[in-house]
């Protein structure tokens, strides 16, 4: 096998290298979901800048005694003689290590927002202010990493927070872009469209998950081989990932809501209320208090935890009542929809039927993922100045209360062109979907007269498109696009 490399993140890597090369005090905030590559980014930047290895400490979700015990364990591992007995000593230790030229990284920093640990922020503030006052004489720095953006913001960006306005730099890591993901898969697995869709639906752009599959030599294997190795063996690395890192954070709260949205992507507020507050057909409508509670749950899951996202039709205002809810993270959605129950049944059911069941459920979920992947490809091509469709608006779907549904609407002001797309995991369904697509597009154009005089294009998107289907679409005046067609400019 070819050795694993460092994929993507080139801009973030350059930014972090520049920070490390300043030879003066820095305090960096790095946020992003768990496993997204925050620690790997730091390690790579340290390696390229020739700095001494950083001192990494992962903060546990615990009380002060648990945190101090974990810190002392790390210190022993690094062969350092210091030990800490209080949070004040921990803050002072960080200051001393930074003055010695170390890069100190505190992972899961958001746990310091917990009441038993919050005093540490004031203690750290005192050290940070001293270091900032001597910035040109301090050769080291502090990096804080966190996976809950809202809690990191509360600790570092809230005006009343002790550490407000203390950071010198901020980085936010999102999923790997499609070009980097294609480079990774081209090197280690292959870029057959069906494989890419399967992996993206399951892992999205989380490099750690791809590396886990690579290390078990199943990244290039069949769907069921990969599922078995990653989820259904006793040593499977991702068997407890969602429960430990996503659902465990919630401690059992919001389970019903998360499962419903995962199984019904695109649910409206009314759909969720009906499903979660009405036990039967003859039940009373939900009370106002129940509606408020459900609204509060949705707000927490969207704004605090970022597990759910509310999407709007293209051109809709933020206050529009046509919003639809989706699980934001592909891995969490795949776990809730297809993997959680089969994995839980391993101890009392034959293994192979469970893997087959999970595979079939994942395949069903890939239809919605295809829409998201195609939209992401359009955006990435436009951002890079590639392809022939420069976007002037965020690409999105369109729907209304009258039943009009369009998978993707892409707008190009430069070329005065608007493109309507139908996405089908099964290419054989594309030809038959065009009549409905064109009818819905006409309703859209009547709704938005500003596009009169623009060129309207129609597009059929599938993972692969055979010559026969391509020709049939072309006879209807429809552009056929496979995933390979879409990402080809990224591979050139």
Where in this protein do the model-derived segments appear?
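Amphipathic alpha-helical "lid/sensor" segments that cap RecA-like P-loop NTPase cores
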Residues: 186-244, 252
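Conserved NTP-binding/hydrolysis module of P-loop NTPases
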Residues: 51-55, 60-82, 95
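A cross-kingdom feature that marks ATP-driven nucleic-acid transaction machinery
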Residues: 323-492
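Conserved small helical "lid"/interfacial subdomain of P-loop NTPases
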Residues: 168-195
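Walker A/P-loop nucleotide-binding motif
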Residues: 25-43
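N-terminal pre-P-loop "Q-motif" helix
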Residues: 5-16
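Sensor-1/coupling segment of RecA-like P-loop NTPase cores
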Residues: 31, 111, 116, 120, ...
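Accessory nucleic acid-recognition modules appended to NTPase machines
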Residues: 227-403
